[in-house]
């Protein structure tokens, strides 16, 4: 069973400055402590997140990804380490520490950080779609009239027209339910959004729409944290990748810093993105294609374009 007893802090959390929005310092999480089943899900996490960036957290199953992000919005608290969350509106940091017996301003924390779970459609429970989308904003203090406007706006943004507002969510298809559930999260208008396996169970069209949604969130100056096992999507969207292994951050960096490091890739069982694998294969066949690494193509379309460019440049020189 998870324990969250209070202990005195051994050090003060470092204040967040500039574009910093979230910091974990010495964060640990242990289940069944001091029993034969003791398991350290997190074992000393130190990392700072900044606004207007997309972070992808990757790692083998059981590496601590979901446990980490569920600390960020207060679903789990730990007796080891601290979390600092930037509250720009009130010009201070919300600090969750071993001394935190009860999180103050919990609604404010929910307003700052929201989370789209792996299958968000199972969160629907109201008798109309409008009420489902309004639930989060109203619970966090938004007036019902404003919440109704938000419901309409974000439902439309997710590709469903306003005629769905009075429909029961239980009359929708699985894909439509997911759109409604995500609209409800977006309507909270959080500064930090966490997506847990956002493309799981989606068809190619749905995956593309989800990627576009994540990229749009970044354009709105939000911090986006994505947990995924799909390395193709990591390469496509991530500004920074955090690789977890056995509850620790093994390394972090840009997608190409991670995926082109053979030592890192050999340490884990993570599959290379197809684009990187193709570059590796081409480089072995002909050294001129090593230049492709410099371009850092994100998608197959990008790769095709830079391959043509590398070939043209080679032909010009020869």
Curated annotation (Swiss-Prot):
Record protein name field: Energy-coupling factor transporter ATP-binding protein EcfA2
Similarity-based family: Belongs to the ABC transporter superfamily. Energy-coupling factor EcfA family.
Keywords: ATP-binding, Cell membrane, Membrane, Nucleotide-binding, Translocase, Transport
Subunit note: Forms a stable energy-coupling factor (ECF) transporter complex composed of 2 membrane-embedded substrate-binding proteins (S component), 2 ATP-binding proteins (A component) and 2 transmembrane proteins (T component).
Pfam families with a match to the protein in the record: ABC_tran (PF00005)
Subcellular location: Cell membrane
Gene: ecfA2
Domain ABC transporter: 22-271
PROSITE patterns in UniProt: ABC_TRANSPORTER_1, ABC_TRANSPORTER_2, CBIO
């Amino acid at each position: 069973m998870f324990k969250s007893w209070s202990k005195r802090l051994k050090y003060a959390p470092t204040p967040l400055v500039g574009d910093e929005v979230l910091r974990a310092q010495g964060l640990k999480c242990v289940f069944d402590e001091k029993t034969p089943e003791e398991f350290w899900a997190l074992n000393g996490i130190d990392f700072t997140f900044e606004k207007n960036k997309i972070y992808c957290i990757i790692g083998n199953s059981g590496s601590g990804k979901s446990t980490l992000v569920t600390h960020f919005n207060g679903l789990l608290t730990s007796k080891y380490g601290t979390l600092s969350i930037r509250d720009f509106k009130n010009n201070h940091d919300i600090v969750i520490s071993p001394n935190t017996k009860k999180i103050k301003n919990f609604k404010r924390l929910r307003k700052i950080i929201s989370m789209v779970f792996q299958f968000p459609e199972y969160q629907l429970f109201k008798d109309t779609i409008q009420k489902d989308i309004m639930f989060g904003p109203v619970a966090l203090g938004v007036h019902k009239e404003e919440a109704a406007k938000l419901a309409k706006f974000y439902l439309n943004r997710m590709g469903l027209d306003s005629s769905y507002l009075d429909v029961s969510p239980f009359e929708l298809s699985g894909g439509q339910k997911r759109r409604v559930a995500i609209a409800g999260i977006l309507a909270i208008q959080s500064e930090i959004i966490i997506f847990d396996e956002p493309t799981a169970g989606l068809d190619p069209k749905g995956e593309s729409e989800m990627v576009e949604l994540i990229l749009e969130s970044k354009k709105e100056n939000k911090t986006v944290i994505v947990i995924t096992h799909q390395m193709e999507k990591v390469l496509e969207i991530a500004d920074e990748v955090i690789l977890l292994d056995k509850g620790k951050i093994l390394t972090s960096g840009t997608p190409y810093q991670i995926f082109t490091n053979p030592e890192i890739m050999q340490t884990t069982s993570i599959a290379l993105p197809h684009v990187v694998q193709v570059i590796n294969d081409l480089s072995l066949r002909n050294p001129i294609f090593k230049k492709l690494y410099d371009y850092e193509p994100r998608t197959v379309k990008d790769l095709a374009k830079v391959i043509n460019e590398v070939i043209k440049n080679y032909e010009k020189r020869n």
